[in-house]
Amino acid sequence: MTPFLAEAFGYAGSLLCCLWSFARTRSTMLMVQMGGSACFLLHWLLQGRGTAATMTALLLGIAALSLFLDGSPDSPRLRLVRRLYLAALLPVALLTAATWAGVPSFFAAIGTVISCYGRWQTDPARHRAVLLASSVPWLLHSALVGSVPGICTDLFGLGRAAWLGWKRCCIGKPLGVRTGLGGAAATVKVA
């Protein structure tokens, strides 16, 4: 029963990792990401993978802190949350160094840094874009360790990023206007 539950939580986590980017608000994105992290935490615990479970728990805590990064820049509460967020990165860095396993760890570390930077962003579009960009190093990590669900999730993230980029660039502009080099708009005659 435990292997089945472990896999079920793993696939549920993968599904949530695919769905978070469809949320409209940053807090909803974070809540869905946290749901995915909770599923992966159970997945790793049931498989007896202590290091992965510990890292997932640490990153789940960072995501929870991210919920409180909104607010007035001069707010004492916001300053405290920012300090706690930065302090929470230290155990992540220490665990990464202590369990280093070569090239896969390198790509996991880059993916983690990009993800943590993305969760620091309070603008929903920037938050989404940076976190989707973290799919690149995570895809390389997943491929190196042979994680098929990880590869599928990361490819979905890259596809979602490409779709959102294309949608932003090419949809919603008036007919007859195309962006030229350097961002200058040139009018094209439409017959």
Predicted regions and their residues:
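Alpha-helical membrane-protein topology signature
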Residues: M1-A191
